[in-house]
Amino acid sequence: MKISEMNNVLFFTYYILGDSMALKGVVLDSGHGGSDFGASGNGIIEKDLTLKISKYMYDRLKALGIPVKMTRDSDITLDPKDRVRVVQDQFGNSSDVVVVSNHINAGGANGKNVGNV
């Protein structure tokens, strides 16, 4: 995977390696949801935008033939344990799974964060 930036937008480029790649799947985690609104501003609510982004990513990855699941596909509340449970229910404790958690941070963030669990 390659991460690049242009005009304060992060681009994630995934390289598909054919049979040599042992990737079991990708799990897309739409940050917040339900009673947890996340950040908001200019009429945009984080939980709605992260779900929209995750649905777009889901469609694109599915079109590429990559096994993909979402922690939520509607406006529901999930605590962190629920999110982990979704991954484990689908893929077990495999290290061959990529989990992408989408968030739109407010406040003092510089607009680009990459973290790991």
For each predicted feature, which ranges?
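Catalytic-core regions of hydrolytic enzymes
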Residues: L17-V117
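Short, Lys/Arg-enriched N-terminal segments with co-localized hydrophobic residues
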Residues: M1-S20
